[in-house]
Amino acid sequence: VLGQGNLNAQVVIVGGSPGYNEDLAGTPFVGKAGDLMEDFFSAVGVSREDVYLLNVVGCWPTETAIPKKKRNPTRGEIKACVDLAYRTIEIIDPYVLLLLGSVALKTMTRDTRTINKIAKDDRIPVLTSYTRGLQVDVPRAAFATLHPTALLQKWDRSDGGAVDLALRTWHRAFQVADKHSQLYKGTTPRFGT
């Protein structure tokens, strides 16, 4: 499943790997997780067409003994695919990465915290070390939060706080991208504040 979206995006949203629904559709972030993302897009005042979506690993890592069961990609799978993800980000040249889940966090940054620790931190961290593996001249901003699939699982357990924090992280990521556009590209505010 290749990345899709706006090649001039200021925000690239990175997940770990596609799931069963994405594999069938050939599109990143569809199904229930995609529906939640659409709600987040609406809440921050953007659409799928405003961003670029990709996964660190383009193939659906599956357990062959259990149909439709997903697992995290192995180090070997990440190593085989990550250069394509890095190159895609270099070409798009966004100012902000929004990292969804632990695979995206660990692959795109040098941050050693777990995604759950970041998600529970009420301060909405900005991860400034987004340049891991990338050839970029300008420091970038990276924000990390739980993947929509994890949020749906937490929501089912009545943990609305994780969803609220994720939405605040999304808002902050788009605010930073908008501010960057205003300062360096002379544009007017684009994203919801």
Where are these regions (language model features)?
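A polyanion-binding, active-site-adjacent surface
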Residues: 1-193
